[in-house]
Amino acid sequence: MSSVNPVAAVEIEGLTVGVAARTLVRGLSMRIRAGEAWCVLGSNGAGKTTLLHTLVGLHRAAAGSIRLWAKPLADWSIEDAARIRGFLPQFIHDTFGASVLDLVLMGRHPHLSRWHWEGAADRELARAALEALGLAHLAERDITTLSGGERQRVAIAALLAQAPAILLLDEPITHLDLHHQIVVLQHLSALARDQGKAVIFSIHDLNLARRFATHALILMDDGIVRHGPAGEVMNAPVLSAAFGYPVLEMQAGERTIFIAE
């Protein structure tokens, strides 16, 4: 297991985020450290995607600050930021065909010197990412021939090949069957636990979130955010309030599960 860096991977102070006249996050202050896997929970329209976009730098906060490894987000160059943090968007659009391997190799571009092509080490990392997600047999397939679930896993593989210290993923298990949902979340959890990555992902499945996340950030009404260790903040009263529907908490052996009433 990797040692924990005393400096927070992501440090948020007084963050307020909104869209139009609506405040989604109000005055959020928190730290995300290396070795932690955070799930972002909330109802549709609560602001999960907007918050992730803000942490990446794609959406301007109304107030507050974000630091990556103690350095203000705005002070990172595009090139340097791409080396230390990676982002998987919720929607992916392909405008042209390419092989699966070539697309995953695109994740290595931030690490290449100008005018240099990918080398053997880059190809090894790309193939390892495909292998980790059960995609090695599709390496030479054209991405336009893939199913939605296969294409989603290829996008995640490209993020893995990028090898950032901070991974932000917007609904990474969308389009995936149960088996591949587990494979992806197991791998993300292992990246945090074994390699000291900071992992932040939005998700709708409460039980998978509770199983694989070490910490949870829950978007409530009126910009209120609950955050902390998943076992503490993920409980029936909080989740019922967040989703506007009664949620029951039960035990299945040593595992906590949530069901709708």
Language model: regions and residue ranges:
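The feature captures the beta-strand-to-loop junction immediately N-terminal to the Walker
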Residues: 41-43
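Helix-to-loop junction immediately C-terminal to a conserved catalytic motif
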Residues: 56
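Conserved ABC transporter NBD signature motif
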Residues: 64-72, 81
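Conserved ABC ATPase "signature" region
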Residues: 105, 120-138
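Conserved ABC ATPase signature
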Residues: 142-146, 150
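Catalytic Walker B motif of ABC-type/P-loop ATPase nucleotide-binding domains
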Residues: 167-171
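H-loop (His-switch) and adjacent beta-strand-loop-beta switch element
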Residues: 216-229
